[in-house]
């Protein structure tokens, strides 16, 4: 069955078997593993997952792809297919019966147009997974793995560093896909970290506000929304003239702790 990729869904199907193998091998699967695949497409990765994992749960939005996947894998005892939108699906509810032992591994070749939205959802629900292997547009991987001081450092970089141990695995050329995209892709491994923040929503809010305008200093971004922002930065050991991309994860945590201790919240301006 031939079905054309839908541009509206950002579909680019991985077709190069060598890269399919590299993505699946990155998961280091055994027959005791449950794998959750987001966006199975025509099933290039799914085929290998069904062969190697004890259980494969796949979520796919496109009904045309559902028909292909059911035809290919419907008779497999270890395969379960969910026709739903990953952006609105409650992963906790979906994976609740298998997630408690943290043996769920997630894999996805994500459409470029929803990749950052999915990633932010995975940050919020990372406790469900033991390991996550994702394929993104290379620019996205460069951003999410950027360290303090790097030119690609941003809001998402800080959130990902706080949530995961990251490993940039390899690049994937445009020719590995059908249709051929205009940009390179890359694969990244994310291993969830335990939470160690007393107020994650505050941490996230501070980081977001500090990167609101990257060319501004952190003080100029924060002083309209936090009372005595300069003093709070100094108490945190942060030069108010620095820019947000230069701060380390520990400095973001210290700043969050200082705000908690001061009992000041964003929205209280000078």
Language-model segments: residues:
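An accessory alpha-helical subdomain
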Residues: 186, 190-192, 198-231, 236-239, ...
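Catalytic cores of RNA-modifying enzymes
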Residues: 1-209, 254-270
